[in-house]
């Protein structure tokens, strides 16, 4: 009995130690572990991720009080560079990212889908070697109905001095990304990121005010039951995409899930498997999603988890944009499910 008791004690202690290790693994510590370095570059990237986390905390706090505060719900009455009506939360979140990175000393430029041109921070530009590209609020239409939203981010190394202020060095493929990820504002606030060494998730512990490691080296299933697409656009798509939708309707084992916030849908697919689709339409074959701020960051992350991302014809990470706000179709998720969609599209061409 004594030996059995000792064995049980050891098992409990090991379990407790693992839980403590996880609880002590903050985002900044994890980044340094992933880079296996305490060099100046590694410290800079750790600081950058901390700044992104701070922006996420501020946005999460604002969203948690959305029904109690002025200036959170509804539209501003303005239209952004994409021709879309601007929500008040879009403006707030965009301003949060700018304010947070103004103080970092690490970022010279921020490029957002809410801004016509990159935002330069002159005092940072002599030393700031990085550019942050981001979608401050994904799914902002969900704000007024208290549904999940997200933020998407990508970090790139600045190339050249960008003396003409055109940010032409950003017009490169998605494989130039150093890091990418998203923040999900749901029942809990989660930050999921990759630096090219796997995909890792963190959950905001409100009592500590820290993002704590939830899961390391997440792998997306090769196949999943979920397909996530706005079927309200059915008659606007090419016939090949409509044929795919008819296929999943008549094939047992598929289930539709679509929230109106891509980050939320992508997170479900990362965990459960499946495919997210935002195809182009007959009138707008280039699609709706922004390559640099939405499609490429999520493609980098999903591919690091063992999934795939494509336009239907070309790997998303191989697409070279011709302009900052370039749009692209997106099919992303489990590799078998993405391949199935591709087969319909490519046969349709």
Swiss-Prot record:
Outline the subunit composition.
Homotetramer.
Q: Which gene encodes it?
A: fbp
Q: In which pathway does it act?
A: Carbohydrate biosynthesis; Calvin cycle
Q: Which NCBIfam families match?
A: PRK09293.1-1 (NF006778)
Please provide the record's keywords in A-Z order: Calvin cycle, Carbohydrate metabolism, Cytoplasm, Hydrolase, Magnesium, Metal-binding
Q: Which reaction does it catalyse?
A: beta-D-fructose 1,6-bisphosphate + H2O = beta-D-fructose 6-phosphate + phosphate
Provide the protein's localization. Answer: Cytoplasm
> Can you provide one Gene Ontology molecular function annotated for this UniProt record?
fructose 1,6-bisphosphate 1-phosphatase activity
Which Pfam families would you find in this protein's record? FBPase (PF00316), FBPase_C (PF18913)
What InterPro entries has UniProt attached to this entry?
A: FBPase_C_dom, FBPase_class-1, FBPase_N, FBPtase, Fructose_bisphosphatase_AS
* Top-level enzyme category: hydrolase
Which residues of this UniProt protein bind Mg(2+) 1? 113, 135, 137
Primary location class: cytoplasm
* Annotated transmembrane regions: none
What family does this chain come from, according to its entry?
Belongs to the FBPase class 1 family.
Q: Name one GO biological process term.
A: fructose 1,6-bisphosphate metabolic process
Q: Which GO terms describe its cellular component?
A: cytosol
> Which residues bind substrate per the record?
138-141, 230, 258, 288
What cofactor requirement does the entry state? Mg(2+)
Name the record gives this protein: Fructose-1,6-bisphosphatase class 1
Q: Which PROSITE patterns match?
A: FBPASE
EC number(s) on file: 3.1.3.11
Q: How is the cofactor bound?
A: Binds 2 magnesium ions per subunit.
Q: Where does Mg(2+) 2 bind?
A: 135, 138, 294
């Amino acid at each position: 009995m004594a030996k059995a008791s000792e064995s049980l004690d050891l098992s409990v202690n090991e379990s407790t130690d693992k839980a403590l290790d996880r609880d002590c693994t903050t985002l900044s510590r994890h980044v340094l572990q992933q880079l296996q370095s305490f060099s100046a570059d590694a410290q800079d990237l750790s600081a950058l991720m901390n700044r992104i986390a701070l922006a996420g905390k501020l946005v999460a706090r604002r969203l948690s009080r959305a029904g109690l505060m002025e200036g959170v719900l509804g539209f501003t009455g303005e239209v952004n560079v994409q021709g879309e009506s601007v929500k008040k939360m879009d403006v707030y979140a965009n301003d949060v990212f700018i304010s947070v990175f103004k103080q970092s000393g690490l970022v010279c430029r921020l490029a957002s889908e809410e801004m016509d041109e990159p935002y330069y921070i002159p005092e940072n530009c002599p030393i700031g070697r990085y550019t942050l590209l981001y979608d401050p609020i994904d799914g902002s239409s969900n704000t007024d109905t208290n549904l999940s939203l997200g933020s998407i981010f990508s970090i790139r190394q600045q190339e050249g001095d960008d003396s003409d202020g055109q940010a032409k060095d950003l017009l490169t493929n998605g494989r130039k990304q150093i890091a990418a990820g998203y923040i999900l504002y749901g029942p809990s606030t989660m930050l999921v990121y990759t630096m090219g060494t796997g995909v890792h998730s963190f959950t905001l512990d409100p009592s500590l005010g820290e993002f704590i490691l939830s899961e390391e080296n997440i792998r997306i299933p090769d196949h999943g039951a979920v397909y996530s697409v706005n079927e309200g656009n059915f008659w606007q798509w090419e016939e090949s995409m409509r044929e795919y939708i008819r296929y999943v309707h008549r094939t047992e084992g598929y289930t539709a899930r679509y929230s109106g916030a891509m980050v939320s849908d992508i997170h479900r697919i990362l965990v459960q498997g499946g495919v997210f689709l935002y195809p182009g339409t007959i009138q707008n074959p280039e699609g709706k999603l922004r390559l640099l701020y939405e499609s490429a960051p999520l493609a980098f992350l999903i591919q690091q988890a063992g999934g795939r991302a494509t336009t239907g014809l070309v790997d998303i990470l191989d697409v070279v944009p011709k302009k900052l706000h370039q749009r692209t179709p997106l099919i992303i998720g489990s590799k078998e499910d993405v391949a199935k969609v591709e087969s319909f599209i490519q046969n349709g061409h």
